[in-house]
Design a protein with these regions (language model features):
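Conserved N-terminal structural module of periplasmic/extracytoplasmic solute-binding proteins
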Residues: 3-4, 8-11, 20-194, 243-248, ...
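Loop/turn elements at helix/coil->beta-strand transitions in domains of secreted/extracellular proteins
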Residues: 38-42, 67-71, 92-97, 116-118, ...
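Extracytoplasmic/periplasmic substrate-binding proteins
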Residues: 48-55, 67, 158-175, 182-186, ...
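Helix-loop-helix "hinge/cap" segment bordering the ligand-binding cleft or interdomain interface
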Residues: 121, 153-227, 251-293, 297, ...
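Structured mid-domain segments that build the active-site/substrate or prosthetic-cofactor binding neighborhood
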Residues: 302-414
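Conserved small-residue motifs centered on glycine
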Residues: 380-522
């Protein structure tokens, strides 16, 4: 989930509200480890959540049974208004009982300085998982500029930083409705232009098959836009580019660009989307719909391209569909070079989880965080990247984890699947943990099963096949997984995993960045959905002119320094791992 940037006024307000929150804050706070165990509602301020309100369903039952708590999710992404909710709660001195938010832009340091989050050190007796991943808390303390256990990052790991962290598939790569690709005759896809021709063939076939002219090859959404169109930034990763602010850096460090680079990766993809628009391949709802609406369309078979692994396959590929040879699969795009980030032992420190300073029953809250970093907690907080809980979804057989029939259903297509009453009842998808905060990397090794948390990589799953996978494998050099195909063709570009958070910006630069981001996002959408080349060129020119006028050179200098610092750290880690 991309964090939504805030407006210039709100950005300045953030600094002010954090400063006000710190007025009168003491350097130490009373420590009380006593807890009467009564049912409590825990307010979770969560910058990554896509749901707001009381946690429902099977995940709610697990938290209630284990800790006697109800989680009340407070989600800026749902509330809207950029960072207004963060600013309002910060100014009041109480973000929430548990806090999940970004460290970027100096926020971590400001939160600690303002006394809005608590040092968990006094509550760590018996908290073995927090101690196990102390590299993460220590790295966060450096970002905070003050010693203490202020929280942990997401996706912590015990695996090598030079090893691709994604497993069977990269996060960002082109997935297509393989059944319609088959009906088109498995055409070659040499480059992105040819890809559009293939998508046009597929769209024509799909519309005829479904008797619906509202089936589109491409459908987008705006929820995650920040420094640019998030959809485009994800597509840039198809070709080995990682995004940091306005900048893009190739995984091997050989190229750096920005959103304004003429004929750079960002503008090339915008041009590709524009061409798709003129070919009638783009859903006209793209500029107004949200993630949920897009997800529904994909689930119902109305979209033919998924630019990332966590959309098409888990939403559409049910067992019943795969048995008919129907579903999403990796496209054989010959020019793709998917970006891969190596495992990060310290975790991704762009976001963290910690305890709010005004929280009561802090010992219980620390126990919850400690548990979230345990194997049991990883499965319980699954949102599709790992198996769901043992007993509910899988069991150990002959020393190996094996999915149950229910586990297979929800792992591959969870829409509409009912949960057994003993696990809380309701629809599985409605009960998924709303935190959207993966604590341990899904492809790290569970010390209890000796396999990954991700069931796609379990031996019991890898040996399974179905008509969809068999047909895909037959036309992809016999590969059994996406990663096997990409690795065989030396397509994956790995950047060694290191924890990195961009340096703090001053308020003036933050305000400039907000203006630039708004201009870039607005012009990008207009360019992508333009109906003529002249209109596209006009929007790109206007985007460049506006961004330059707002001081883009300063932003570029800052972002280039950040990506080069990040790359230097990656190279150092890679060298040490040899």
């Amino acid at each position: 989930m991309k964090f939504k940037k805030f407006s210039g006024v709100v950005g300045l307000m953030t600094v002010v509200s954090l400063a006000l929150a710190g007025c009168g804050a003491s350097s130490s706070e009373a420590v009380n480890t006593k807890d009467d165990g009564k049912l409590i509602t825990v307010d979770v301020f969560d910058s990554r959540a896509n749901y707001q309100g009381i946690q429902k369903g099977w995940a709610a039952k697990i938290f209630k049974d284990k800790f006697n708590v109800k989680l009340n999710i407070i989600a800026p992404n749902v509330a809207g208004g950029g960072d207004t909710l963060f600013d309002t709660r910060s100014a009041a001195g109480n973000l929430g009982d548990i806090v999940i938010t970004t460290t970027g832009g100096g926020r971590m340091k400001k939160l600690v300085k303002a006394g809005l989050i608590s040092d968990m050190t006094p509550y760590l007796k018996g908290m073995d998982n927090i101690k196990k991943f102390k590299k993460s808390s220590e790295a966060l303390a450096k970002i905070a500029g003050k010693n203490g256990v202020w929280g942990l990052g997401m996706g912590v790991s015990t695996s090598s930083p030079t090893k691709p962290s994604e497993g069977v598939e990269q996060q960002d790569e082109p997935y297509i409705r393989w059944d319609y690709y088959r009906e088109a005759g498995y055409p070659e896809i040499k480059d992105m232009d040819q890809f559009l021709d293939v998508l046009k063939q597929m769209q024509d076939i799909a519309r005829k098959d479904q008797k619906d002219n509202k089936v589109y090859a491409i459908s987008m959404f705006k929820d995650w836009d920040g420094s640019g169109m998030a959809f485009v930034q994800h597509m840039a990763a198809w070709f080995g580019y990682a995004n940091q602010g306005s900048a893009f850096l190739k995984a091997d460090g050989t190229d750096e660009q920005t959103v304004l680079t003429k004929d750079g990766i960002y503008q090339k993809i915008l041009a590709w989307l524009h061409k798709a628009q003129t070919m009638g391949l783009v859903d006209p709802d793209s500029s107004s719909q949200n993630w949920d609406k897009l997800h529904d369309k994909v689930t119902n078979g109305k979209v033919l391209l998924s630019p990332f692994s966590f959309l098409g396959k888990p939403s559409f590929n049910s067992g019943e569909r795969k048995a008919k040879g129907v579903g999403f699969a990796l496209a054989p795009l010959q020019t793709m070079r998917p970006y891969s980030q190596g495992f990060i032992n310290e975790g991704d420190l762009s976001y963290f989880i910690g305890i709010g300073s005004k929280a009561k029953n802090k010992q219980r809250l620390v126990k919850i965080i400690n548990w979230l970093y345990s194997p049991e907690g990883v499965y319980a907080s699954s949102n599709g990247t790992t198996a769901c809980p043992k007993g509910m979804c899988w069991e150990m057989k002959d020393g190996q984890p094996v999915l149950s029939e229910f586990g297979e259903k929800v792992q591959f297509a969870s829409e509409g699947v009912e949960v057994p009453a003993q696990w809380g009842g309701g629809i599985y998808a409605d009960g998924i943990c709303a935190l959207n905060f993966p604590t341990i990397a899904p492809n790290d090794i569970d010390p209890e099963t000796k396999q990954t948390y991700n069931s796609f990589l379990w031996p019991s799953e890898l040996k399974k096949t179905n008509p969809l996978l068999s047909d895909w494998s037959k036309h992809m050099d016999g590969a059994k997984t996406e990663f096997e195909y990409l690795n065989k063709h030396k397509m994956v570009m790995v950047q060694a995993g290191v924890p990195y958070s961009a340096p703090e910006e001053n308020s003036a630069q933050s305000a400039r960045r907000t203006q630039i981001n708004s201009a870039v996002v607005a012009a990008s959408w207009k360019a992508a959905l333009a109906n003529s080349q002249s209109e596209f060129d006009k929007e790109i020119k206007e985007m460049t002119t506006k961004a330059d006028g707002f001081g883009f050179k300063d932003i570029q200098k800052f972002d280039y320094a950040a990506i080069n610092e990040h790359m230097a750290m990656s190279k150092k880690v890679a060298e040490a791992a040899k």
